[in-house]
Amino acid sequence: MNTLKMQRRIAAEILKCGENRIWIDPERIDDVASAITREDIKRLIKEGVIKKKPIKGQSRYRAKIRHEQKKKGRHRGPGSRKGKKTARMGKKELWIKTIRALRKELRKLKAQKKIDRKTYRMLYIRAKGGQFKNKHQLYLFLEEHGLLKK
């Protein structure tokens, strides 16, 4: 049996694709084997004996399912994590999250008149300095120093 290597190469050049994407009709292999010029190959392409196969894509089916599961909070356990804690949530992001929560709490306390303006400002600056890791520590400090008004 003929390998049709030359015909395949010429067809690939004409159809502007790789040699692996060339389909040759198995019924008309003898016609293709006798084709030696570019014109012969072009004629066979026109007749539909030689065709260009479609590109094989990469299926997103499994990826979509996995993404849906991740949206539900699955696949996020310690065994699935790669990289440090800071790689998953940056230090700055974490700081912003913490400081916003503290400042919101301070504003709430000031609005409820549980702390005065002077105390608010002092606590605001201490929060900015990183004295409080979370709201719990803020409240511990307030109780320790008797700064909360009843």
UniProtKB/Swiss-Prot annotation:
Keywords: Ribonucleoprotein, Ribosomal protein, RNA-binding, rRNA-binding. CDD domains: Ribosomal_L19e_A. InterPro entries: 60S_ribosomal_eL19_sf, Ribosomal_eL19, Ribosomal_eL19_arc, Ribosomal_eL19_CS, Ribosomal_eL19_dom, Ribosomal_eL19_dom1. The keyword Endoplasmic reticulum does not apply. Residues 55-89 are annotated as: Disordered. GO terms for molecular function: large ribosomal subunit rRNA binding; structural constituent of ribosome. Belongs to the eukaryotic ribosomal protein eL19 family. Binds to the 23S rRNA. NCBIfam families: PRK08570.1. This is Large ribosomal subunit protein eL19. The gene is rpl19e.
